[in-house]
UniProtKB/Swiss-Prot annotation:
Coiled coil: none annotated. GO terms for cellular component: chloroplast; chloroplast thylakoid lumen; plastid; thylakoid lumen. The gene is FKBP13. GO terms for molecular function: peptidyl-prolyl cis-trans isomerase activity. This is Peptidyl-prolyl cis-trans isomerase FKBP13, chloroplastic.
Amino acid sequence: MSSLGFSVGTCSPPSEKRKCRFLVNNSLNKAEAINLRNKQKVSSDPELSFAQLSSCGRREAIIGFGFSIGLLDNVSALAETTSCEFSVSPSGLAFCDKVVGYGPEAVKGQLIKAHYVGKLENGKVFDSSYNRGKPLTFRIGVGEVIKGWDQGILGSDGIPPMLTGGKRTLRIPPELAYGDRGAGCKGGSCLIPPASVLLFDIEYIGKA
């Protein structure tokens, strides 16, 4: 299965057979990303480590969701629908707790693990950590993920923090996600179209 460097992604060097990693935060420039890498404790898993930014021909930074051309071959095109009543914060970020956690909440700057399924508003799945068989490991609250994730997990603007073991659905407006640029764009088509509202089912596993 061939891999694809998306408009806001990063890849491993061409000599290494690893999937492109989807960018979670598209606001960092290359210098900032390298500086963040030097300060950050990175997982020993090579797929979650910083890759050579130039290999995808992009200047944005790393650590994020895994995408490849054949991703949807192994994941349902439509998400499983579950009734969920959303509470909406002033920022437009909405949440619904399907399972309230039992353990400690995340602390800003902490390395945590979370499983997730990402969907468009029409229910089409564009990414799933469950499909890859392992959770995403990232540092929360420092810009490694889109703003909607940081706010939706840490708690902000009237949204309570997630607790370890909790399962929450986030409905994220474009301004807290990928904005008017969209993501995963190539040849006039985008996996995440511009100005998309995104739905994420997140399972907060806890501290990494």
